[in-house]
Amino acid sequence: MANILLLDNFDSFTYNLVEQLRNKNSNVLIYRNTVDINTILNSIKKIRNPILMLSPGPSTPKNAGCMLNLIKKVKGEIPIVGICLGHQAIVEAYGGIIGYAGEIFHGKASLINHDGLEMFEGLPQPLPVARYHSLICNKIPKNFIINSYFNDMIMSVRNNLDYVCGFQFHPESILTTSGALLLEKIINWASLKYKG
């Protein structure tokens, strides 16, 4: 059972994500990105082996309340998982570059290619996923690897040193056919930070 602090970036998918996590027996504590960062940091300190999960949301990482500062405060200390806007914020907080995708993807099902490792091990290749975004990662930060892509677009990244990963697509969407299994594998991978 994982202990997850979920930062809600005011997205309609947030509670789909919460439901899937709770269905896998995870404890999920939710804070909106407008909450004072010190309140969130104090909560993290009280959680045993916390995983910070960053929800999807509108706009850009810079406009997502305390999210960027929160990542900068806890990176390297606890595992972090980001979805869509959360993924973009991870990339930006670690020094990567986010830019416009050139088109808007809203409810688009795409077949992505992945590396078959860690959270993607045993999943279909290519993997059908749901995409809702207008921004993408243009340059990954140091110590990150690209572990999935669609054409030339980065769809996910992973940092094996800090146990941080981000997904441009939505594992919690019904259009991501193996999404529940992928989320379970993501949480299992992030939890490895506390086993080493």
From Swiss-Prot:
Molecular function terms, GO-annotated: anthranilate phosphoribosyltransferase activity; anthranilate synthase activity
Which PROSITE patterns does this chain map to? GATASE_TYPE_1 (PS51273)
Provide a GO CC annotation, any one. Answer: cytosol
Q: Name one Pfam family in it.
A: GATase
Give me the reactions it catalyses.
Answer: chorismate + L-glutamine = anthranilate + pyruvate + L-glutamate + H(+)
Tell me which Gene Ontology terms the entry assigns under biological process: L-tryptophan biosynthetic process; phenazine biosynthetic process
Looking up Gene3D superfamilies in the UniProt record yields:
3.40.50.880
Q: What is its EC number?
A: 4.1.3.27
Q: Which CDD domains does the entry mention?
A: GATase1_Anthranilate_Synthase
The entry describes its oligomerization and partners as:
Heterotetramer consisting of two non-identical subunits: a beta subunit (TrpG) and a large alpha subunit (TrpE).
- The protein in question is named Anthranilate synthase component 2
Q: Source species, please?
A: Buchnera aphidicola subsp. Schizaphis graminum (strain Sg)
Gene (name only) = trpG
